[in-house]
Amino acid sequence: MTIRLEKMIPLPMLEQDTSGSEVWEKESVIFEQGKSYIIEAPSGRGKTSLLSVIYGIRKDYRGKVLMDNLPLTDLSWKEWSKLRKQSFSYIFQGLELFDSLTARENILLKNSITAFKSPGEIEEIARNLGMEDFMDRKAGILSFGQQQRVAIIRALCQPFNFLLADECFSHIDQENSSIAYQLILDECEAQGAGIILTSLNENANLSAQNRMIL
């Protein structure tokens, strides 16, 4: 799968100076499956907007976004539903967890739809992220960094061609963010998938084949 932006920019960004951007309104920006991309920018530069456009939940943009040469605007609701189940996994900046459910229940809710990971595989990921003792606590009482780790585990419980990650390490310490990122890269490699990750600042501890300034 290939995602291509052609002179694309979200409409609200037209009011800003985007002259230094390596993404907005460029002739062609290509994201290829199997490759890793880190998009760096301060707040308000449209990082969430970019991922929301690619995921199909934001349509207020100028230019074109194509997936394997098919404009996203041509996709039906049914096609988008299938893509979000099989081709795109998303770690939302706001996480979108259910506070009244436990960490485990939030994860299993996704895995019950996809049946992609075994209970043992989920437990192993949780151990690697230092979350094994928090899996049966309500998501609403976990720290934001712990919630981010729950969202990461959940995102890995489905097949995907691209993983979209919106500032998913912002409240995780450097050691655990490095562990989490390596888990993500390992899963992407196993699935032959790409990752598009947004970040507020340059993360020297996170490696990527491509870095772009938004």
Predicted regions located by residue number:
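Conserved ABC ATPase "signature" region
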Residues: P119-F134
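ABC ATPase NBD coupling module
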Residues: L72-S89
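Helix-to-loop junction immediately C-terminal to a conserved catalytic motif
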Residues: Y55
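Catalytic Walker B motif of ABC-type/P-loop ATPase nucleotide-binding domains
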Residues: L163-E167
